[in-house]
Amino acid sequence: MSALRRSGYGPSDGPSYGRYYGPGGGDVPVHPPPPLYPLRPEPPQPPISWRVRGGGPAETTWLGEGGGGDGYYPSGGAWPEPGRAGGSHQEQPPYPSYNSNYWNSTARSRAPYPSTYPVRPELQGQSLNSYTNGAYGPTYPPGPGANTASYSGAYYAPGYTQTSYSTEVPSTYRSSGNSPTPVSRWIYPQQDCQTEAPPLRGQVPGYPPSQNPGMTLPHYPYGDGNRSVPQSGPTVRPQEDAWASPGAYGMGGRYPWPSSAPSAPPGNLYMTESTSPWPSSGSPQSPPSPPVQQPKDSSYPYSQSDQSMNRHNFPCSVHQYESSGTVNNDDSDLLDSQVQYSAEPQLYGNATSDHPNNQDQSSSLPEECVPSDESTPPSIKKIIHVLEKVQYLEQEVEEFVGKKTDKAYWLLEEMLTKELLELDSVETGGQDSVRQARKEAVCKIQAILEKLEKKGL
C-alpha cells in the first residue's frame, strides 16, 4: 500500500503525497489541493460505513476500483485518476445495492465464477432428480443448460449423464418419449434384450447350448455372471414365454417365481412330486442335467438341499423345491450325504411313544405294541397312552416323601384318578383283548394308588 500511495494512486493520500509525488512533480501549485481536499473527507467515510454496515459500501468501493482499474490497482493514471477514484467514492450510493455479494461488486460481470457457483445447488437438485426418477430431468435443466452439462459431467461422465441417466430412467420407469429408447434398452434390458438374450445365452461357452432345440434360452440378468456354474438353463426353456412377456426390468420377467408357478402343474411349490415339474422337457433332459449339478453344489452349497437345483441355475428359483428326486437319481447318494431331512422316513409312532417316556422302563410298553401298530385298534392305543402316563406317575409316587396333607400327594392322587377315568372311557367293542388290556391297566393304577396311600400315612 505504501508503494501505491507513493505512486500517487491511493484515494486516501494526503496533500503531502500529492505535493511530492503528484503528477505535476515537485511542489504542486495551490490548485491541486482544492481538488484533492474533497478526497480527504472521503477516506474517513469507509470506516463509518464499516461500523454501520459491516464493511459493505467501503469495501465494495475499493474492490470496485480494483476491478475497474480506477483505485488501488490501476493500470496507470495520476491524480486525475484519483479524481475519478473520488468520483467512484461519490458513486458509493449505488454500490450498497450489491451488499448481497459482499464487497465483490464486479462479481456480476464475472459470469463464470459467481454464476456457476450459485447455480450449483440447483444443479445438484437437477442431477439428482433426473438421476433418481427422471421426472424432473426436463424441468430444471432449461435454465442453465451449459452449466448443467459441465457440472453434471464433473460427477457423472457428461455424455453418459445426459444420455443414459436422464433419458434412460424416464423411458424405463415412465416410458416417456423424452429419451431415446435404445439407450434405456441397453441400460435396462427390455423387449429388445429379451429377444437378444436367448441367443446370447446359447452362444456362451459355459452354458450347454440347447438340448431342447425348440426351446430358447432365458436371460438371467444376475445369473449370467457365474460361468463356473454351468447353467442347465435349457431345462427352463418351457417358461421362455413367461420370461420374455413382462418386458419391464424387474420382478415380473426376470425372476422365475411367476413363470415357475405355472410350470409346476401339481401346484405345490415345495417338494410337490417325484416326477419332473417340466411338462415338456422333464424326461429328455434328465440325463444331461446331473453332470451340471455337481459344480452347482460347489458354488451354491445351500442349493444342495434341493435336488432339483441342478436343473435350474437360479439359486432362488422355486423349482429347487419341486422335483425332489427326478433327475439326479445317480447323484442321490451325494445329496443324501449333504442334505439331512429332519427325520423324514421315521415312523412317528415310535417318536410319540418314546418322547413322553423319559424312563427306560417306559419304552418297553410302547415297543411291545408298535409292531402291530397299524392293526392296533384305537381303544388299545388309548390304553397304551394311559399306561405311559401311569408309568411316569408311578415313578413320581416312588420318589414321593410326605403326608396326605401335602400338595404333591393330592396332585399325584388326582392324576392317577384321572387316568383311571380315562381307562373307564375306553370302549371294548366286544373284543376280549381290549377288555383284558383295560383291566390290567386299571389294576396297575389301583396298585400305584395304594402304594401312594401307604407312603402318605
Swiss-Prot record:
Which residues get modified to Omega-N-methylarginine? R40, R53, R108, R185
One GO cellular component from the entry? nucleus
Q: Which residues form the BAG domain?
A: 379-456
User: InterPro entries, from UniProt?
Assistant: BAG_chaperone_regulator, BAG_dom_sf, BAG_domain
Compositional bias of kind Polar residues? 166-182, 320-333, 347-365
Q: Does the keyword Transferase apply?
A: no
Give residue numbers for the modification (Phosphoserine). S7
According to the UniProt entry, its GO molecular function terms are: adenyl-nucleotide exchange factor activity; protein-containing complex binding; protein-folding chaperone binding; RNA binding; ubiquitin protein ligase binding
Going by the entry's taxonomy, the superkingdom of the source organism is recorded as: Eukaryota
Quaternary context? Binds to the ATPase domain of HSP/HSC70 chaperones. Binds to the death domain of TNFRSF1A in the absence of TNF and thereby prevents binding of adapter molecules such as TRADD or TRAF2. Binds to the death domain of TNFRSF12. Interacts with PRKN.
What is the stated purpose of this protein? Inhibits the chaperone activity of HSP70/HSC70 by promoting substrate release. Prevents constitutive TNFRSF1A signaling. Negative regulator of PRKN translocation to damaged mitochondria.
Protein name as catalogued: BAG family molecular chaperone regulator 4
